[in-house]
């Protein structure tokens, strides 16, 4: 079990960062070969990113729904440029699975894929965690205890920008 941080904590991030959400949805369960190829492509990508922090991914959390069969991964990146560089590089394990998806699945409707990208500036976010292990932003960045100045969401939002 991961180490719990007792009490309440937040994160203070002084540099811009990127939140990238990515997921897939099985639309035709019987098309297992197609959706399995999509879902199994994520493991090698995460392995490379974990072993090579210079590529810019700072952390990730995964979520899964049984029906309809869906996945969602929330990832935190140092910059949008790092994310795009990884996605487009033929030396990294994203480009080939993307090309395979477009060739073998494309618009046939068997598997849905999606992503959303958000650039976040210091002070344009807030977070709180209570009696949790490092999670989300609290895993991607250093967790700090809640103080009198960061007790409320309205105090945390914009706290970095005001410094």
Which residues does each PLM region occupy?
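Short S/T/G/P-rich N-terminal loop/turn motif that feeds into the first structured element of a domain
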Residues: 1-65, 70, 82-85, 109-163
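Tryptophan-centric aromatic hotspots in well-structured domains and transmembrane helices
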Residues: 76-78
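An amphipathic, aromatic/His-enriched active-site/gating alpha helix that lines ligand/cofactor pockets
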Residues: 80-113
């Amino acid at each position: 079990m991961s180490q719990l941080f007792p009490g309440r904590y937040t994160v203070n991030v002084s540099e811009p960062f990127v939140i990238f959400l990515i997921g897939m949805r099985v639309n035709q369960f019987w098309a297992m070969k197609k959706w399995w190829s999509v879902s199994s492509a994520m493991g090698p990508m995460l392995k490379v990113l974990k072993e090579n922090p210079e590529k810019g991914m700072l952390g990730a959390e995964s979520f899964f729904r049984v029906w309809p069969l869906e996945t969602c991964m929330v990832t935190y990146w140092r910059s949008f440029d790092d994310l795009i560089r990884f996605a487009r590089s033929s030396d990294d394990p994203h480009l080939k699975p993307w090309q395979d998806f477009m060739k073998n699945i494309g618009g046939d409707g068997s598997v849905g894929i999606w992503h959303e990208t958000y650039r976040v500036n210091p002070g344009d976010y807030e977070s709180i965690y209570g009696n949790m292990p490092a999670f989300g932003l609290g895993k991607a960045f250093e967790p700090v205890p809640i103080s009198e100045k960061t007790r409320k969401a309205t105090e945390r939002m914009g706290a970095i920008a005001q410094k």
